[in-house]
Structures are given as structure tokens and as C-alpha cells.
Amino acid sequence: MANHSQLGFQDASSPIMEELVEFHDHALIVALAICSLVLYLLAHMLMEKLSSNAVDAQEVELIWTILPAIVLVLLALPSLQILYMMDEIDEPDLTLKAIGHQWYWSYEYTDFKDLSFDSYMIPTTDLPNGHFRLLEVDHRVVVPMESPIRVIITAGDVLHSWAVPTLGVKTDAIPGRLNQTSFITTRPGIFYGQCSEICGANHSYMPIVVESTPLPYFEAWSSLLSSS
């Protein structure tokens, strides 16, 4: 959950998000190093006179050709590794289908019989004390902690996007097309997200709430919901 005046990322709650935060820090260090080098060279040019030999030197041309290539490699390798990790879905313990509508989400637990529900935002007038405005829903997505979860995402009308920042998940929901993503929650808790694709007048009223619980609690919840 983001805090007021927060500048950094939310606390990572999945291995993918942890990797994304580390890559952000890595890229930021590289960018700061480049900025420092450029500022140093600018200051040196302003304070010192340049000779024609320095401008036309082959060594300088070689350096400013090789250095950008090294920088690109330093950024590309970890980026490609994370991209492959985000696309890899290996034997999930649970498959969840998320369907975007104007303006709510429908969920189907395909591994269970008759376990599906619609998830609407709770209006501000009905919101209990201590809950978050425009983020709470009447039915949360409950998943077992530390288990691979596959999410199949589509839409029933227009473009939507299923996004939960603290899990490092953001996948477009496209009518007539099935996209998929996966995540593993590393701790129990409640994680908030929203539709991240402009989808109409009430686009900002499509929150997503994922609740991560230990496996026994998830089994009890699924049994209760299936029997009701």
C-alpha cells in the first residue's frame, strides 16, 4: 500500500517485484554514473581550453563508442532475465481467471467447481471505518501464500488492465483474447491494485484487492464459498 508523499516503490510482495526493484536501483546507479561523467566533462570543457588534438583524437572516439555499448549491455542483461522470468509459468498450484467489465471484475477459480464471483468497489457511503477509499471491494481475490498462481486475464467489453503493483503484475485484458501472468506471494497480507487502462467514465472505480493467506485458511475460504 502506497503512503502519502512516498517516492519509492511499494514493499515488494513477490519475487518478481523484488527483481524489478533491484533492476530499478541498478539502472539508477548507471544513470547517475553517466550524469556525473557528463557533468565532469562539461565542467572540464568550460574551465579548460580544448586543443584540436583532443577533439580529433582517435582514442576519444574509441572510448565514446565502447562506453555506450558497455552501458547497454549492463542494462540489457538483467532486463532480459527479468522479462523471461515474468513470462515463465511452471506448474501453477492455482489457476485464476480475471474478466474485466465496465466497471467491475469477475473472477473464476478454474480448479474448483462453482467457485466464481463478481468484485465491485465499495461505495464511499458504505465504507466501514478504517478502510481505504476507492480501493476496497465487496469480494477479494484470496490466494494461498507461497504458491505459484497463474492468472488468465480477458475482458468482456472494452480494454482493461489487471495490475497489482506490490506483486509486480500488470497485464492487459483484451476482449476475445486470453493473456496470462503469474506471481507468488511471499508474505500474508492484502495487496491493492486498479484497472490500469482507461476504459470509460468509471475507469477509476475498478479496484483490485488480492488477499494472501496461509494454505489452511485458503482451503477453508474456498470450501465455504463453494458451498454457499
Swiss-Prot record:
Cofactor: binding details: Binds a dinuclear copper A center per subunit.
Binding residues for Mg(2+): 197
Disulfide-linked positions: none
PROSITE patterns named in the record: COX2, COX2_CUA, COX2_TM
Binding residues annotated for Cu cation A2, in chain numbering: 195, 197, 199, 203
InterPro entries for this protein: CcO_II, CcO_II-like_C, CcO_II_C, Copper_CuA, Cupredoxin, Cyt_c_oxidase_su2, Cyt_c_oxidase_su2_TM_dom, Cyt_c_oxidase_su2_TM_sf
Signal peptide extent: none
Localization: Mitochondrion inner membrane
Obligatory cofactor(s): Cu cation
Keywords per UniProt: Copper, Electron transport, Magnesium, Membrane, Metal-binding, Mitochondrion, Mitochondrion inner membrane, Respiratory chain, Translocase, Transmembrane, Transmembrane helix, Transport
Protein family per UniProt: Belongs to the cytochrome c oxidase subunit 2 family.
Record protein name field: Cytochrome c oxidase subunit 2
Chain's gene name: MT-CO2
